[in-house]
């Protein structure tokens, strides 16, 4: 599913029909000192292929809730991130290792990472950040985050809770008063 797909749309294409959506708040303090609840949700499911067993977590955020607390149904939650834990199955001889995946799949397909911090190979393009790391000989972890959704969150917070945003909201509210 593309970034910003809403929760119901993504749920309709997940192969596992027994998924449970978990909702939680992520509190964030603005520069002005306001504590905001950022509405988040996540879905976990498993996918098994010929060579791997994957545990996939899809992370969603409700940017619209920052603008108005009435925007709280599932269609307002948009895809923000994906985390995969990939376990390599026993392939006999030759046995694939996490190092093989990093070397022959990640580096060959994505090239030199923008950054390597000693643990994570970090790639970035205009839309997302892609991070991959070796957990052990048979397990890797992949994290993908949408930069566009992150910017949407920052813009919504700035639009609503900055000094200019608060003044703008006050002007809109005053327009509704007849004197």
Label every PLM stretch briefly:
Residues 34-36, 43, 49:
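N-terminal segments of secreted, surface-exposed, or virion structural proteins that
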């Amino acid at each position: 599913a593309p970034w910003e797909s809403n929760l119901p749309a993504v749920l309709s294409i997940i192969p596992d029909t027994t998924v449970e959506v978990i909702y939680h708040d992520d509190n964030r303090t603005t520069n002005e000192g306001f504590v905001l609840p950022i509405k988040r949700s996540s879905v976990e499911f498993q996918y098994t292929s010929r060579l791997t067993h994957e545990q996939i977590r899809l992370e969603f955020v409700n940017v619209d809730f920052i603008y108005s607390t009435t925007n709280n149904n599932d269609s307002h939650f948009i895809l923000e991130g994906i985390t995969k834990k990939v376990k390599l199955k026993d392939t006999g001889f030759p046995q694939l290792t996490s190092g093989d995946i990093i070397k022959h799949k990640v580096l060959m397909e994505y090239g030199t990472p923008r950054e390597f911090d000693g643990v994570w190979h970090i790639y970035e393009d205009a839309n997302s950040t892609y991070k991959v790391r070796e957990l052990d000989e048979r397990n890797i972890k992949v994290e993908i985050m949408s930069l566009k959704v992150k910017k949407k969150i920052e813009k919504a917070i700035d639009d609503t809770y900055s000094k200019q945003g608060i003044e703008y909201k006050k002007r809109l509210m005053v327009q509704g008063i007849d004197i």
